[in-house]
């Protein structure tokens, strides 16, 4: 199991280090200035904010968008909870990453690149835990005047753990923590900074 985990981590590391947008990337993600946050709600009333520390992404010249999240980088501010999420919820040995793909109209990018602020409704495909689902997501794209684009969700996105076969993992987390309940509905917010590819 340890060797398999190391091999998966090596493959993921190579993917993260590779030029994520290939030759056609117009903008590449600045991981250090980007954030994907999600909220877990336990015992029906206690909310806690978590995040991911490592991801790569790009926007292509044709408006194709891809974001890959390293699930092993989950950060809950409690080390043992990080490990439980990796092992019991995400099963990162088998499913080391989540991926979002979308298509943005070139006109949206052109307007934002001129310094504009554009709101767009996008069908975003989320691939997680071996399953895929298309999510309607409202995003705001802001041109920052230096060739960079900031993209963020206009409102939180609700993801249902059951849609991705994660409900047994949620139950496992609930049991090991001795909680009465953990919600399967998870609000997610995204804030991304893309810089012009070199």
Segment roles from a protein language model:
Residues 2-11:
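Bacterial N-terminal signal peptides that target proteins for export
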Residues 4, 21-25:
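Extreme N-terminus of proteins, especially the signal/transit-peptide cleavage junction
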Residues 10-19:
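Bacterial N-terminal signal peptides
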Residues 25-198:
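Low-complexity, acidic/polar, glycine-enriched regions of mature
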């Amino acid at each position: 199991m340890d060797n398999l985990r190391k091999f998966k981590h090596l493959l993921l590391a190579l993917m993260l280090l590779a030029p994520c947008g290939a030759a056609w990337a117009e903008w590449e993600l600045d991981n250090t200035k980007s954030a994907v946050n999600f909220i877990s709600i336990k015992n029906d009333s206690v909310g806690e904010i978590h995040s991911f520390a490592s991801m790569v992404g790009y926007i292509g010249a044709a408006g194709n968008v891809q974001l890959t999240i390293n699930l092993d980088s989950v950060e809950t501010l409690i080390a043992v909870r990080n490990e439980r999420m990796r092992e019991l919820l995400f099963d990162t040995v088998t499913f080391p990453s989540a991926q979002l793909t979308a298509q943005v109209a070139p006109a949206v990018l052109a307007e934002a690149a001129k310094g504009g602020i554009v709101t767009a409704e996008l069908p975003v495909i989320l691939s997680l835990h071996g399953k895929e689902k298309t999510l309607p997501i409202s995003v705001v794209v802001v041109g920052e005047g230096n060739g960079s684009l900031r993209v963020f969700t206009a409102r939180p996105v609700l993801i249902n753990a059951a849609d991705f076969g994660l409900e047994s993992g949620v139950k496992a987390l609930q049991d090991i923590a001795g909680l009465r309940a953990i919600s399967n509905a998870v609000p997610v917010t995204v804030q991304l900074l893309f810089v012009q590819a070199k």
